[in-house]
Amino acid sequence: MIWSPAEQLPRAELRVLQLERLGSTFGLEIDSLDGLSGLPFTSKSTLRDAYPFGLLRVPVGELARVHASSGTHGKPTVVGYTPADLEMWTELMARCMTLAGVRPGMLVHNANTYGLFTGGHGFHQGAERIGAPVVPVSGGMATRQAMLLHDLGAQVLVSTPSYAIVVGQAVQNAGIDPGSLKLELGLFGGEPWTDGLRGEIERALPGLRAVNFYGLSEMCGPGVAAECIEVREGLHVHEDHFLVEIVDPQSGAPLPEGDEGELVFTTLLKEAMPLLRYRTGDIASITTEPCPCGRTTARIRGLRGRRDDMVIVRGVNVYPSNVEHALLSLPDAAPHYQVVVERSGSMDELTVQCEPVGAEVDSVGLRGDAERVLREHLGIRVRVDVLAPGTVPRSEGKAVRVVDRRS
């Protein structure tokens, strides 16, 4: 189902619309989108230097709401929304959720955290706009989540992908037959994840189809891009609202379509805090190949994760998603892991902590298998510690995948 005609605009018309909105929002006079590459970037440091409200284009008193990032690497990124921004965000979330398969009347179990985090509110607003009732459970209390999923019969689960695994385990621990749940869709975002984890989620919650969502608080929160339920091969970017580029992470030079690089976004309609050429730190590629679903928008592919989470070990770039992909190729490895980085002399050393799927698994054998597949996938030797089931920390929000002990 198509929510907005903008999802099927011919590419040439879309570029004209983007150029018009770019000029209107930023007062730029450029003849083509190719001129964008000559303009400066904004980044996390830009926002930190302007903390908390230095980049607002309207007085604080004219805002309708304020959200903020988690501030994992320092002070949080504060984002303001005018009433028009909230309306835009709601429409974008309705568009995303519709392309992901949500229909009017479907009961949505929202296990994303509410508060400063945008995830809970964004999905709530989008569902209500579609006409899908919401159970605003928020995060935490996995046993209660399992009970409510069973008793209320929700058809849609919203959470981070790592928390979906926690909920699936809670369903089993509560003695509930996962096959008795009425779940049809899982809408997951807030952290990078792989097709391997998608498979683990769908096995833990049978009948559910897992769909990937992408967003960041600096843009609006969730609602920037999402997979279509028909294909699930790349996240459709809402290009009438966000202009996306791929640049070289080191030089900032534009890269051709299909090359892997850093995602850069420009907001085209935001009022409170428009951002020009914002460097996300997220590594992926872009394709404008037509999608079988009928949408013409560009798609994000191969989203590895943030450069902040990348670890360089003996000259090799290692992302948590690389580790996840390798581990989940092993049937005895559970979808819970952490990457621990430590300094040994002048070298960085990597240890992957993981768990077996059950206490009956031979941990020595799993360790050997894990070290082998990690060496094959990463090209370097990595130490693996197999911990007892339930030892790797769980999270109700974004999973902590990298533990840096070098300082």
Predicted regions mapped to residue ranges:
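Generic structural signal for residues in well-ordered beta-strands
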Residues: 134, 210, 244, 337-339, ...
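Active-site phosphate/ATP/adenylate-binding loop shared across adenylate-forming ligases
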Residues: 4, 38-205, 211, 223-229, ...
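Conserved AMP-binding/adenylate-forming
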Residues: 193-290
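Conserved beta-strand termini and adjacent loop/short-helix elements that scaffold enzyme active sites
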Residues: 137, 213, 247, 342, ...
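AMP-binding/adenylate-forming catalytic core of the ANL superfamily
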Residues: 157, 264, 269-378, 397
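Nucleotide 5′-phosphate-binding alpha/beta core
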Residues: 1-68, 73-91, 95-99, 103, ...
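Short, solvent-exposed loop/turn segments at the edges of secondary structure
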Residues: 181, 239-241, 306
